Each structure stands twice: as structure tokens, then as C-alpha cells.
């Protein structure tokens, strides 16, 4: 069975594991999921990312991050550009999430970057998701 939207599936798995406070989760690997996971790690939303080679496409293991008193670090994830309705922005219209408290993940000609990096490089692209 083919998956229509693997990015939405990845974000949903993170959201669900986060809601029940799991320590980690595993998803089938792809380059875009790996790039998104690296951005989430770099921005401090997740603790760590591991890549496991299973002689097929591989597996990405994501270790979730929680604050004091087991508070969630990720309070929300939202898929923006969907297969049925793509969402593109120009360099001067890159969105801010919660006035800069969250991040927008954008797929550009220079790879997958955050909204801050896209503004700094003055490039637009496809808005994949918001994380806050």
C-alpha cells in the first residue's frame, strides 16, 4: 500500500507519541523526513535522531524532548502544504509562527530550512509545516 502523504504521517507520529509522552518513536526513513528531523533537533524540539539501516529504506528513530515536570517541548505541529493543495511563498512572504516563537519548515531550492534561514538567505519555497 502506498502512502499519500509521508510528511503528514511523520508529523502525526511525532504528535501522537508526544501526547502520550513516549521517549522515542520510529518511522520509515526518507531524505525529507531526515532533513525535517535534523531541523527539529537543531531548533531544540527533539532530543536526538538516530538512523538505522535495515537493508530496505532504513528507519529514523526520533527521541522526544520533555522539560521540567515532564512538560512537552512540542506543543503543536501542523502540516501546511498538502498533496491536494500545495502552499508556496516568495522570499518576502515567508511566514512567522507565533511571532517567532515557533518555526516554519520550508522546502527550498537550497534544501529544507527554517523560516529564519529562508529569510536570511532571501529565498522562498514550499511551506511544509509549522512547529511550535
Curated annotation (Swiss-Prot):
GO CC, alphabetical: ribonucleoprotein complex; ribosome
Coiled coil: none
Pfam families per the UniProt record, alphabetical: Ribosomal_S8
Keywords per UniProt: Ribonucleoprotein, Ribosomal protein, RNA-binding, rRNA-binding
Superkingdom as given in the UniProt entry: Bacteria
GO molecular function: rRNA binding; structural constituent of ribosome
GO biological-process terms attached to the record: translation
Role description: One of the primary rRNA binding proteins, it binds directly to 16S rRNA central domain where it helps coordinate assembly of the platform of the 30S subunit.
Summary of subunit composition and partner proteins: Part of the 30S ribosomal subunit. Contacts proteins S5 and S12.
Family statement: Belongs to the universal ribosomal protein uS8 family.
Protein name in UniProt: Small ribosomal subunit protein uS8
Record organism: Levilactobacillus brevis (strain ATCC 367 / BCRC 12310 / CIP 105137 / JCM 1170 / LMG 11437 / NCIMB 947 / NCTC 947)
